[in-house]
Amino acid sequence: SKGLPNGVPVDEWGIRMEAGTCNPVGANVSRGGATNGPAAVYAIRKWDEWLRAYAPPGAAAMDFYQSLPSLSSGNVAQQIFWYTAFTASLVGKDPNNKVVDANGMPLWRMGPSPKGPYWEEGMKLGYQDVGSWTLFKSTDVERRKAAWLYAQFAVSKTVSLKKADVGLTFVRKSTVNHKHFTKRAPELGGLIEFYRSDNRNVWSPTGINVPDYPKLAQLWWQHIGEVNSGTFTPQQTMDRLADEMDLVMS
């Protein structure tokens, strides 16, 4: 569905939740969801096709940690999932870094997410995790106050600027717009231009339709692997995934 930061009434997970409620209705098309709908099936089929046609040899057999070192080998044409925390290892001079030139300038470029045939204006177009600080009511008041002071220090302008300069993860708009990053922008492969553009607004986090992220997230990789292995077709896989998601949410 259309809607930012998440679609209403159906979000990017394909989970339906009627407006004005906090209870998910379901993920299966039969329950008004979209996890096994045409758009989701198309996305999984296209991912499988691209993996087979364009990924480096052996990529399909890699796990998450094996895939990370391969990025700096220079044998990857396009990456569809990326943690900004890893950007620092992809920039700068290093004999083992094959994705920068002799001057340390990136040979890659970050860009907005591509649009599929089912995407419409007003829908989100990408995903990014959003961090937060949680202060428990059960914690002693004085300790909560200390934690609150530390949190303010950790996200202050000066500290945020330094952390972003080293790790290339941003928590403040002022950091993104700082003159220091205007100077560094050419060596960061489009990262600064992206976060200064409106494109960042359609990269939104998981929304309130997802009642139990850990339980539901683990279902995804288990089922998606069955497409890659050829055990099930994309439609069969998404049907099975939608059924299991509804079972978890019931």
Q: Each predicted region: which residue ranges?
A:
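Extracytoplasmic/periplasmic substrate-binding proteins
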Residues: 38-143
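Second-shell loop/turn segments in exported
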Residues: 29-34, 137, 206, 227-229
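Glycine-centered hinge/linker elements that transmit conformational signals in sensory
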Residues: 2-61, 113
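Bilobed periplasmic-binding protein/Venus flytrap-like ligand-binding cleft at the lobe interface
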Residues: 76-77, 130-169
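Periplasmic solute-binding protein
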Residues: 1-28, 122-136, 215-225
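Sec-exported extracytoplasmic/periplasmic mature domains
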Residues: 48-56, 72, 76, 91-94, ...
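Long, aromatic- and glycine/proline-rich binding clefts that accommodate carbohydrate-like moieties
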Residues: 106-115, 164-222, 226
